Amino acid sequence: MSELLVRTLSGLIMIMLALIAALQGGYVFALLVAAAATLMFFEWTRIVRGWGFGWQAAGFVYALLPALALLWIRERDLHGFMLLLWVFIVTWSTDIGAYIPGRSLGKRKLAPTISPNKTVEGLFGGIVAAGLLGGAWVLFTGLGQALLLFAPIFAVAAQAGDLFESWMKRRAGIKDSGTWLPGHGGALDRLDGLVPVALLTAVAQMAGLT
């Protein structure tokens, strides 16, 4: 089975699980979020082993804050589920929009010393995909119009989160944060873009912009 097929199938399974848990909300969604945060913290501590206590403590914050943000978004009001799906759409479309153009059209390296496979073309592909799909969801659901602007901006934040995790792995001398997810590596590899998008969306929600 090709790597792309494995990546696609495992990605679809993860998306289905996330959507089912998000739809259920309550304890079901909280359990999934807690499991993901635990895996993220475990992988973080493995990556930063020997870097000092500050990095270990930062991992706890890194895993906890986006988990709380996702729970806040989902349970805060009647629009929580729709807003949570917007978070997923922006994050996933950024990832896919960056992956496909980056693989097929990418020529200019975005950050060659950190992540040699990431390209400028992939960056813009992710921004465009998030802007279009995230914007379409806003118009379809009637969420706050500010999210039309936030979608491409948060796409940049998602890719910055990806680059930050890539920098950590390069410093630690490892390729993937874990081996839990076939074709994707570990939880951090899959959720590094979700972290900033969840946090920024929670802030926007608290500011009444969603």
Across the structure, where does each feature detected by a protein language model lie?
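Membrane-embedded alpha-helical bundles of polytopic integral membrane proteins
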Residues: M1-V156
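C-terminal-most transmembrane helix of multi-pass membrane proteins
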Residues: V197-A198
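Interfacial loop-to-transmembrane junctions
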Residues: R171-L194
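Juxtamembrane boundary at the C-terminal end of a transmembrane helix
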Residues: A202-T210
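Pseudouridine synthase
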Residues: I100, W167-R170
